């Protein structure tokens, strides 16, 4: 609260100062820039506002007002409380001023629609844009302080409305989500106030809540709250403190232009994403409103992006990671889309970086960073996936997509944002950097690729992916004490962390020694336990469980049904089949064994026996790895 209040007051004060300067946006920019330097985070806000006013003045002005108001409101909910508690009438006044100023912007630009709600919120604000509004604003603030959520909601709604004015539907969605999230965001605002202040411009972005729907569209919670909460929890966890440091540490990102960006804001504030008048439906590929929401969300995320990525990075905690992985798996498709977007964004960011090196590149760096982090998390994910499931990469995705989007949004937001959405197509993926590709083909993705329709695989699969996946696998193996490199000693080495399905693959892969007890049926990946008790006995030896029997072993196998690793073949006793690619299967079982040692030949032989020739090596390898990670997930939970 303190920070948010301070940020808010600074924000408001600069705003009030800029109130007069408002007419001179350039001056505002300069002033903001100056302020920016003095008060970094506060500057951000002014800076952002500046960006807002400057870049988005006409359209954004509405957004600005709304976003500012909403930002204020959102911040206010808590901040207002704090303010009222702090008897920061001054702050309120500044806020009022700010409101009027915002109003002036919006009023000046005649963006009343956004202000419809705003008016409701700042009843007097709009009417008497400059001084008169203060009381109403004050009232509003007071009201907000008394009922921060309502106001925050209203403000958010306003923001979304103004922001969404371009997309009325979006605004509605945004409003709802924003409303829902306003309190959340209020928190967020407090925590990330600085950067959220930069968000102010993007308060509309704050609409991010709406994006949740976008996320929901991706299979995440459609409710922004779920997503936001997850993100909030995840992000805030690591980000709150981190955010301050990171956020500020990333001044380039936060105030890309703070840093003597030669052009104050030739590009509207980096985070000043005015949602393109036409919602970048492409990104969310949902409805336009959702697209707008998504855009908002992305934009928001861009600002939020910092913390999200921090969170993820910082907190590549199991929750985040696991959630990321699993949700990523779930949303891999969407994720991929987003990743594509993200990648595109990254590309665009890169391009933008060229355009706006600082911001961009902070952002971009961040972005890349985040992606890298995410990838890293992804690596971690398998184990954490379960716990993190909630937060899931959805957050990641959205964050990543968001991240990417934001920067890119910010930079190319106006022009490129749409293009980005359009470009989100898989092709973009290809264009995207390896890191992105890896991210796309992250373990979850790979796992998904193995488990899910091959259609996904193409996107997921990439040479880079393979290596990425391999890394993950290696990590997995290392974590499980499995030796990926020593193929020959695979089984003995994997003891303890070896999973039953891996053990079965190993047996099937050694027909000379195991043909008597287990063998491929020759129908795809079907295999039969010819001597189930012998298999169970060997498994018991492997796991040092002398009491192991087929009854217990079959229970373990049933666990794999749920995991999508294998299925029971109906109508036949002791006949099971692996659901994933053979290649993926072996890769998962042996790591990179396929490329290494005689086992590779054997494995090929086994594959031929299985009569399921591997599809694309890359895809399969990747899939297996991922699948493996997926499995480990399970394995980590249940080591049979």
Curated annotation (Swiss-Prot):
Induction: By starvation.
One Gene Ontology cellular component annotation held by this UniProt entry: nucleus
Summary of the tissues where the protein is detected: In the adult brain, expressed almost exclusively in dopaminergic neurons.
Region named Disordered: 315-375, 609-628
Any Pfam family hit: Ets
A Gene Ontology BP annotation from the UniProt entry: response to starvation
Coiled coil stretches, renumbered: 321-356
Biased composition (Basic residues): 356-369
Protein's UniProt keywords contain Transcription regulation: yes
Biased composition (Polar residues): 609-624
Listed PANTHER family: ETS (PTHR11849), ETV5-RELATED PROTEIN ETS96B (PTHR11849:SF282)
Protein role: Required in dopaminergic neurons to regulate expression of genes involved in dopamine signaling. Decreases expression of the dopamine transporter DAT and increases expression of the dopamine transporter Vmat and the tyrosine 3-monooxygenase ple which is involved in dopamine biosynthesis. Also involved in negatively regulating the expression of a group of endoplasmic reticulum proteins, the molecular chaperone Calr and the protein disulfide isomerases CaBP1 and ERp60.
Family membership noted in the UniProt record: Belongs to the ETS family.
Name assigned to this protein: ETV5-related protein Ets96B
Species annotation: Drosophila melanogaster (Fruit fly)
Native organism taxonomy: Eukaryota, Metazoa, Ecdysozoa, Arthropoda, Hexapoda
């Amino acid at each position: 609260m303190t920070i948010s209040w301070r940020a808010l007051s600074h924000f408001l004060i600069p705003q009030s100062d800029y109130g007069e300067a408002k007419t001179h946006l350039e001056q505002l920019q300069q002033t903001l820039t100056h302020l920016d330097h003095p008060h970094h985070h506060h500057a951000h806000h002014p800076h952002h506002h500046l960006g807002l006013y400057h870049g988005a003045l006409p359209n954004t002005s509405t957004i600005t007002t709304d976003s500012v108001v909403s930002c204020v409101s959102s911040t206010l909910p808590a901040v207002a409380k704090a303010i009222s508690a702090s008897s920061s009438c001054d702050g309120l006044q500044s806020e009022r001023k700010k409101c009027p100023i915002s109003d002036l912007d919006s009023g000046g630009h005649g963006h009343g629609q956004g202000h419809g709600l705003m008016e409701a919120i700042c009843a007097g604000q709009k009417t008497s844009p400059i001084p008169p509004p203060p009381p109403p604003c004050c009232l509003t603030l007071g009201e907000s302080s008394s009922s921060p959520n309502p106001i925050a909601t209203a403000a958010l709604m306003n923001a979304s409305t103004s922001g969404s004015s371009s997309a009325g539907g979006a605004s509605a969605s945004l409003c709802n989500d924003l409303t829902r999230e306003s309190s959340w965001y209020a928190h967020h605002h407090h925590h990330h106030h600085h950067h959220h202040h930069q968000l102010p411009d993007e308060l509309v972005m704050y609409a991010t809540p709406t994006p949740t729907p976008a996320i929901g569209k991706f299979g995440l919670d459609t409710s922004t709250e779920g997503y936001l909460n997850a993100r909030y929890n995840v992000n805030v966890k690591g980000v709150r403190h981190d955010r301050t440091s990171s956020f500020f540490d990333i001044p380039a990102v936060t105030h890309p232009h703070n840093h003597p960006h030669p052009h104050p804001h030739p590009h509207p504030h980096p985070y000043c994403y005015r949602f393109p008048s036409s919602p970048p439906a492409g990104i969310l590929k949902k409805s336009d409103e959702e697209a707008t929401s998504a855009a908002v969300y992305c934009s928001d995320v861009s600002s939020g992006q910092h913390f999200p990525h921090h969170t993820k990075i910082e907190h590549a905690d199991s929750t985040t990671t696991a959630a990321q992985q699993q949700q990523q798996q779930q949303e891999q498709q969407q994720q991929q889309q987003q990743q594509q977007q993200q990648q595109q964004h990254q590309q665009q960011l890169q391009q933008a970086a060229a355009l706006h090196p600082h911001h961009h590149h902070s952002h971009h760096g961040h972005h890349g960073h985040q992606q890298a982090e995410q990838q890293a998390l992804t690596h971690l994910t398998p184990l954490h996936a379960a716990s993190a499931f909630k937060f899931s990469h959805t957050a990641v995705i959205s964050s990543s997509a968001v991240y990417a989007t934001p920067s890119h949004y910010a930079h190319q937001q106006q022009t490129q944002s749409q293009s980005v959405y359009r470009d989100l197509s898989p092709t973009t993926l290809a264009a995207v950097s390896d890191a992105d590709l890896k991210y796309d083909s992250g373990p979850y993705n790979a796992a998904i690729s193995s488990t899910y329709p091959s259609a996904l695989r193409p996107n997921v699969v990439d040479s880079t992916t393979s290596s990425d996946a391999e890394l993950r696998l290696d990590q997995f193996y290392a974590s499980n004490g499995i030796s990926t490199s020593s193929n020959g000693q695979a089984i003995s080495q994997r003891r303890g962390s070896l999973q039953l399905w891996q053990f079965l693959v190993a047996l099937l892969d050694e027909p000379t020694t195991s043909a008597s007890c287990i063998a491929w049926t020759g129908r795809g990946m079907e295999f039969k336990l010819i001597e189930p008790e012998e298999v169970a006995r060997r498994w018991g030896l492997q796991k040092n469980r002398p009491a192991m029997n087929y009854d217990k072993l079959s229970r373990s196998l049933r666990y794999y049904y749920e995991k999508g690793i294998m299925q029971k073949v109906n109508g036949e006793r002791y006949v099971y089949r692996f659901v994933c690619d053979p290649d993926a299967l072996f890769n998962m079982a042996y790591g990179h064994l396929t490329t290494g040692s005689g086992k590779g030949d054997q494995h090929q032989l086994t594959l031929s026996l299985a009569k399921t020739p591997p599809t694309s090596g890359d895809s399969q390898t990747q899939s297996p790895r991922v699948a493996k990670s997926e499995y480990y997930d399970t394995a980590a939970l249940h080591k049979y």
